[in-house]
């Protein structure tokens, strides 16, 4: 994949918000197709792609499409995408935080029971899914943010916003303080023609405080 001409990472000590080049990431599973369009990345998902481990359903899916890059300790990752194409059951787009096949988090939007939901699946051996309906977010440009931190550095704070709203808290969850990667995610468990347009992937300074919203840009 060709790059979009922007830099990837910098040391946390001097980090400012910076875009990540699409070419800096590696796919957990190659999608059905990708193309660059004016600096945005359009991803076509493969039918049946998903991430889930065991809980309730009994099955394990480890074949979603995550574009992963370095995620430094004490840093945040932000992924922005257009939600207009999420129209079929279980269509998903957002961010994947990955420390291994049994320790990962996916956070973003998913269409469930005909309604768009904002949520997160936190997996430590088995998956734990939390979600809330956001029907008014349909068709908007969405940013999902995940910030590493906590007293021991072993937690992640997930927030989300639309292009016209402030940050909304989604989840605070345990997450390894060790090596991990993160980046855009798309899954299409039920169809083979989902395309999602990602407009930005960025690294930013970590949240200063759990109860203080990060900057909007």
Per-range role (PLM):
Residues 2-217:
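Extracellular glycan-recognition regions
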């Amino acid at each position: 994949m060709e790059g979009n001409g922007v830099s990837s990472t910098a040391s946390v000590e001097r980090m400012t918000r910076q875009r990540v080049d699409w070419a800096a990431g590696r796919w957990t599973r190659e999608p059905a197709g990708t193309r660059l369009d004016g600096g945005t990345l359009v991803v076509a998902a493969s039918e049946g792609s998903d991430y889930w481990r065991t809980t309730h359903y009994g099955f394990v899916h480890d074949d979603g499409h995550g574009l992963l890059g370095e995620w430094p300790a004490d840093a945040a990752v932000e992924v922005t995408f257009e939600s207009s194409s999420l129209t079929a059951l279980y269509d998903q787009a957002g961010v994947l935080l990955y420390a291994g096949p049994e320790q990962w988090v996916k956070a973003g939007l998913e269409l469930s029971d005909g309604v768009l939901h904002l949520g997160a699946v936190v997996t430590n051996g088995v998956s734990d899914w939390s979600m809330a309906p956001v029907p008014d977010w349909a068709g908007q440009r969405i940013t999902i943010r995940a910030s590493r931190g906590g007293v021991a550095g072993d937690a992640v704070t997930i927030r989300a916003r639309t292009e016209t709203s402030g940050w909304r808290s989604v989840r605070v969850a345990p997450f390894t303080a060790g090596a991990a990667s993160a980046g855009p995610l798309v899954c299409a468990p039920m169809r083979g023609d989902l395309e999602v347009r990602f407009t930005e992937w960025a690294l930013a300074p970590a949240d200063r405080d759990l109860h203080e919203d990060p900057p909007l840009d």
